Each structure stands twice: as C-alpha cells, then as structure tokens.
Amino acid sequence: MNAARAAAAYRRQFGSEPALLVRAPGRVNLIGEHTDYNDGFVLPCAIDRDTVVAAGLADDGRLRSVAADFAGEDDDWNMSSGFAAARHGWADYVRGVAAVLCEAGLAPGGARLAIAGNVPLGSGLSSSASLEIAVGSALARLGGSEIDPDRLAQLAQRAENEHVGCQCGIMDQMIAARGIAGHALLIDCRSLVCRAVPLPSDAAVIIAHSGVRHAHAGGEYNDRRRQCEDAARHFSVAALRDLDLITLERGGAGLDPVVLRRARHVVTENARALAAADALAAGDLPAMGELMAASHLSMRDDFEITVPAVDELVAVMQAAIGPAGGARMTGGGFGGCAVGLVPRDRADAVCNAIAQGYRAPDGSAAEVFVCRATGGVSLA
C-alpha cells in the first residue's frame, strides 16, 4: 500500500518512474525506555507499519521531495549549500539525513524523493526514525553505496540530534535498520551489539494509541537527557549504564531529588530490559508482564513521562490481560501508545476491553492494532 502510494506520488510530482523503492519500519519498544542515550539496554521490535521512499537520481545538485501524507507538501533544497531548516517539519528530517550523507561522501549529486507511510505520527512508534532510515538507505543506494546498518543508524541519529534538535539515542534508528522478522532485539546501546530474541509463537503484540500526540524535537525529552547527564557527572561515570542501584542509593546525598529519581529509573530499567530478554526467550509471559508493570510505574513516578490518559489506557489493558502478560507505556512519553504482550488467544478480549473501557481526552476511541515483528530496512 505505501509502496504504491509513494510510487504514484513520485509519478505525479516528477513525471517519471522512480528508480527504486525503499521501506523502513516503525518500531515498538517492549521495555527499556530512555536507556538508549544512557548507553544502556533496550528491547524493541520492528513492526508492520512503515515508511516507503520512492527515489530517483537527478544531476542538478538539488534534493526535491514530496510527502504524500501531507497533502502533497514539497521541498526543494540545494544539497551543496549546507543544512537549513525547511518550511515543513518533515522536510527537516529529509534534509538532515541528506546533509550527513553528503558530509560522509555517500549522497548522490541530486535526487527526487516521494514519501508515504502509515506509522502513526506522534505515537511513540518512531515515525521519525522510519523516515530517516528509509531516506538514508534510498539516497545511499542512489549514490552507489551499500551502508552497513549500524553506520546508517548512526548517521540517521546524528541527523536528528544535529539538524532536528532532538537529542535521541540510537535505539529507534538501530531497530529500523536491523530489525529481524519474528524477533525483538536486545540492543546494547554502547557497543551496538544486538541479541535476537524470538517472540513466543503464541504471543501477540497489541499497540493502542492514547489519542494524545507527542513531539520530541526538544522540550521535556531533552530535559530528561540533561538530567541523566547531570546524574552521571555527580557519580563520576561515563553514563548511567555504569551505575548500579546500591551505588546510586549510597551516593545520592547532595543530588537534586528529581535528578536522583531520573537516575533510579534508568538504573532499574536497564536491569528490567536484561531480565525481560531472558523472560521473553524462555516464553515466560507472566514474568515479562511483571517487568512491564514495574517499568510503567518507574516511568510514571521516577521519570515522570506518562500522562493521565496513557496511565488510564495501561490500567485498562493490564486489567484485561491479568497475570498472563503485561502492558506499559511505550516510546519517549508525554502521550503516544501503550504496548501489551499477551497470549494470542486473549488478544481479541484485550482489544474489546480497550474499545469498551477507554476514551481519549477528546472522547474518541483508541486506535488499536495487533502487530507482527518485521525485518529492518529493505527494498520495497
């Protein structure tokens, strides 16, 4: 669907057929929130919602892009002029990725792009990284380069940090680049070593949107990162990944109580992510559910990134799932989605419970879908 829409938008805008189509998935993080930029551990899986870029070469040094999902908004940028903010927010991601590829000598001399996707915006499912990885892969292929997935992820993260203004970690870009069908990935965000963790065949991943959109290009998200860096400096460690709970509790005197809570979330969330990978590999959904519940409480009370609507949605899901699995907020916070991991034979009952028991602040029902774990970036 997205491939056909992207190709059609390309033909309308540029009057020719695209040379290639590239897709990159969104993702859902099962556990490990705000640990990536602390050099910690995360456990996401790529999902069957994606962004597709239809791409073709140009020889005029310009990058022209059109977004099928924004009423055909377009952008025109001189690739040799250095990054400059665009009129449209989505185009900053496109320009940012192109700029870092140009600096790395991996971009073509000019390109035409048409973009279509179905990763819900502002949902915590990483529509931004999906776009970045699809654009980066498409431009590199047009330029005759096959980028290693890890490097592609690092370049895309750099684009978002430097040109969009969100000081995100590497998780979203890594899972979009390296996702494996049927698996979650335990990612060590310091070494970038990934462990493929099979999802139990009898488990379903349910995603429900709270109806509250978030935006992470600054503000509260970046504040959390600064607080984590303050805590790391207090304890004289390179990152909070290097801190254990005993040291945290013994050495917290003199640290701002808010910063101490932020650090406690990261330290305990790292431990939960590692334990969750083992529970998932063993097919132990009840243990996974306990870890997800603890993660949500930590995000609510220590990291303070949930909102009342998300807390309500998670409570509805947890009540419907019971001890058979779990649910938690997923994504950077301040709105977005909840994720549930449940026995497949309970998926319909959980979806029905959400439909009957939750309403967004505007009175609308939650958007709910059962997703499957897919592979990372590829030709569409």
Task: Enumerate the predicted regions with their spans.
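C-terminal nucleotide
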Residues: M1-R27, I31, V52-R87, L186-A327, ...
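Gly/Ser-rich oxyanion-binding loop with an adjacent helix/lid
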Residues: M1-V22, R27-G32, N38-F41, M79-S81, ...
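Short Gly/aromatic-enriched secondary-structure transition segments
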Residues: D39-A46, R224-R225
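Short, charge-rich binding segments
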Residues: P44-A46, A54-L57, H88, G105
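Short, amphipathic alpha-helical segments that act as regulatory/interfacial helices
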Residues: I47, A98, C102, E229-A232
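FabD-like malonyl-/acyl-CoA
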Residues: A129-S130, C337-V342
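Glycine-rich phosphate-binding loop
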Residues: F334
